[in-house]
Curated annotation (Swiss-Prot):
PANTHER family: THYMIDYLATE KINASE, UMP-CMP KINASE 2, MITOCHONDRIAL. GO terms for biological process: dTDP biosynthetic process; dTTP biosynthetic process; dUDP biosynthetic process. InterPro entries: P-loop_NTPase (IPR027417), Thymidylate_kin-like_dom (IPR039430), Thymidylate_kin_CS (IPR018095), Thymidylate_kinase (IPR018094). ATP binds at residues 7-14. GO terms for molecular function: ATP binding; dTMP kinase activity. This is Thymidylate kinase. It comes from Mesomycoplasma hyopneumoniae (strain 7448). The gene is tmk. It holds the Pfam family Thymidylate_kin. Coiled coil: none annotated. The keyword tRNA-binding does not apply. SUPFAM superfamilies: P-loop containing nucleoside triphosphate hydrolases. Keywords: ATP-binding, Kinase, Nucleotide biosynthesis, Nucleotide-binding, Transferase.
Length: 211
């Protein structure tokens, strides 16, 4: 089982995903639960170096180069972590995946959507999540969280303006309509409230999966 979590910056993806992993461990005690993130991936030196370069405020790179670097890090992530874990029958939870590239590089940066989609289909060998959970929060709440928790330490992508994030959200709304496995959850509540919404949704969704 492969589940990805999506949303704009400071939407609570990382925190809620970790809480959801604890729930899955109780629901599927016989399964190993792997949590990871993009860009980068846990303990993947090469991909983490790309992450550091991408997020550094000191680097000025074009949207096209940004897209290629994200794709490169994703391929490393797949080869070294995601594919082996799935092959071993583990449950993989990933904070961001291909949909982030479509929303951020495609809609946010204005690159051709078909180009971004085709590139990522190629490098992933059409490996897509069984389920994607999009945490939908207000931009004002995202900015409030970034201001409280990160202050002047925001990375290059987090320093984008409101109009950029409006385009990114439009991208996620597009994916909600386009992908039958892509679902929107209201992320404006507390982490526990959002987790309850996800668990309630997952229980109903999983019950309909072919066994």
């Amino acid at each position: 089982m492969f589940i990805s979590f999506e949303g704009i910056d400071a939407s609570g993806k990382s925190t809620v995903m970790d809480l959801f992993a604890k729930y899955l461990k109780i629901k599927f005690p016989e399964k190993d639960i792997v949590t990871t993130f993009e860009p980068g991936g846990k303990n993947l030196k090469e991909a983490l170096l790309i992450r550091e370069f991408l997020l550094s405020k000191n680097n000025q790179i074009s949207p096209y180069v940004e897209m290629l670097l994200f794709a490169t890090a994703r391929r490393i992530h797949l080869e070294r972590l995601i594919w082996p874990a799935l092959k071993a029958g583990k449950i993989v939870l990933c904070d961001r995946y291909i949909d982030s590239s479509i929303a951020y590089q495609g809609f946010g940066n204005g690159l051709d959507i078909d180009l971004v989609t085709s590139l990522n289909s190629l490098i992933s060998e059409n490996t897509f999540p069984d389920l994607t959970i999009f945490l939908d929060i207000k931009i004002s709440k995202s900015f409030e969280r970034m201001g409280i928790f990160r202050d002047h330490n925001r990375d290059r992508l987090e320093n984008k303006g409101v109009e950029f994030y409006e385009r990114v959200i439009n991208g996620y709304e597009f994916l909600t309509k386009k992908n039958k496995n892509f679902f929107k959850i209201d992320g404006n509540g507390t982490y526990d409230e959002v987790l309850d919404l996800i668990i309630d949704f997952f229980e109903k969704y999983y019950a309909s999966w072919p066994k």
